[in-house]
Amino acid sequence: MESTLKEMRDGASVLDMDPKSTVGGGVEDVYGEDRATEDQLVTPWTISVASGYTLLRDPHHNKGLAFTEKERDAHYLRGLLPPTTISQQLQEKKLMNTIRQYQLPLQKYTAMMELEERNERLFYKLLIDNVEELLPVVYTPTVGEACQKYGSIFKRPQGLYISLKEKGKVLDVLKNWPQKSIQVIVVTDGERILGLGDLGCQGIGIPVGKLSLYTALGGVRPSACLPVTIDVGTNNEQLLKDEFYIGLRQRRATGQEYSELLHEFMTAVKQNYGEKVLIQFEDFANHNAFDLLAKYGTTHLVFNDDIQGTAAVVLAGLISALKLLGGSLADHTFLFLGAGEAGTGIAELIALEMSRRSKTPLEETRKKIWLTDSKGLIVSSRKESLQHFKKPWAHEHEPVKGLLEVVKAIKPIVLIGTSGVGKTFTKEVIEAMASFNEKPLILALSNPTSQSECTAQEAYTWTKGKAIFASGSPFDPVEYEGKVFVPGQSNNAYIFPGLGLGLVISGAIRVHDDMLLAAAEALAGQIKEEYLAKGLIYPPLSNIRKISVQIAANVAAKAYELGLATRLPRPENLVKHAESCMYSPAYRYYR
């Protein structure tokens, strides 16, 4: 040991040292790793050819026991795998049996994430073939719990972490990502994760989960997806004190420091990947969400799922519900509990659709839509104190405080909850809705399940089976007086994967409101009479890939119509083109 330290002090390289001084009768230490002391640098050598041991640990190419005899010979896998060869279908069956044995959703989530880290195609095969069962596992509501506990369950990095430490070097950080042909980026700053608040850097679970759905449901290649978290600190005291927290331990940066980092990121993305890369803003706080969309909507291909995606999926549900309610959107009155990014985004898209259909000015159609916030009904007498995104919804009416009083005063046929506060649709509120509506439409959209404004059981029971109900998080079927009601799920997963695919295949350079309307109309067009007969206003998620194809084709058509598409010439059949562009998780055969 003394001789080793002497050689180090004399400036000798690790590779120049006598192997016998530190390695006792073992394999020769070619790279000097065993001879290096803890404070000495070594080179992290890797084998670049995907074969043998390396191939089995490459999630993009690993097939586990599904490697054929020929592949095992060609890629030096003999002896590295048990002798049996099984199909991808049998692998899927085995893993689903294992996952179903777990009692806790978080255990299932962890199992799925571990599968993605070792066999990417099998992960997507499971998710696509079992979408209704696994969607709540890899995304809402389970992903919320995963983000809360991310520091404890963190094993290996997923996605790209850009913190204030990287300010001035963001372009270099983007270049560290191994995949170069990126088409979709989902980025969060972790300030408003679902209905759970500020989770800081641990919000990375949301972009990771979202992009897995872009692939599974929308067919965007996994290698073309990039999850990003912008870490500017957190105001969550619990996380700041948590020894396992993985992010910056400081209060959240705001103002110029925040906007400069975001601007550097947006500029670097365009510089590195071009202007046809879709950037989806995810779970930003209200003030930043609206500002970012307004600031970059004219210069980048940007989309906010909380504002625009939620709006499109709710609008699709309302268009479907008209077949049960009768009339047009303009014939009905809408009331929102919650006037944040989701509430105002939905309201604006409903008003826009009304305006397009009825050829009425937007200012007029907005008057059919009422919003309430924590201070009560948004009315014109409050206009001076309102945030800018609430002002278009301040109508002439006397101030009304409580939700029950608002419902009785406005008498809406549609009640939409986007408050992020659970149990706010009380028995009295729901009963009031049923008292003046033959079929009250109740949408409890807040996530996760614990934050839902009411449950499906409550909606059906309190309206005596009259309600048309849909929620943001899934609920089990409800039996009331001998009849089984199947609650719909107003899940953004119906819209954003198909929208993303449509933007990618058309080479769109901007997201236009008419594309959102096109996506909503395509989704509403997939609802059949048999679904409506059960009170469903959304089609089954089991058909989501086919639905995404229709949405993608509609969105792409609108991009070409608006002159925003760059992939020319336009394909003759956009539906077939969308299908042909979708990623398939089936195993490839290797030479």
Curated annotation (Swiss-Prot):
PROSITE patterns: MALIC_ENZYMES. The record marks D306 as: Important for activity. Its cofactor is Mg(2+); Mn(2+). The active site is at Y139, K210. Residues 1-10 have a biased composition (Basic and acidic residues). Residues 1-26 are annotated as: Disordered. Coiled coil: none annotated. It is found in: Cytoplasm. GO terms for biological process: malate metabolic process. It comes from the Eukaryota. A divalent metal cation binds at E282, D283, D306. NAD(+) binds at R192, D306, N447. It catalyses: (S)-malate + NADP(+) = pyruvate + CO2 + NADPH; oxaloacetate + H(+) = pyruvate + CO2. PANTHER family: MALIC ENZYME-RELATED, NADP-DEPENDENT MALIC ENZYME 1. This is NADP-dependent malic enzyme. The lineage of its organism: Eukaryota, Viridiplantae, Streptophyta, Embryophyta, Tracheophyta.
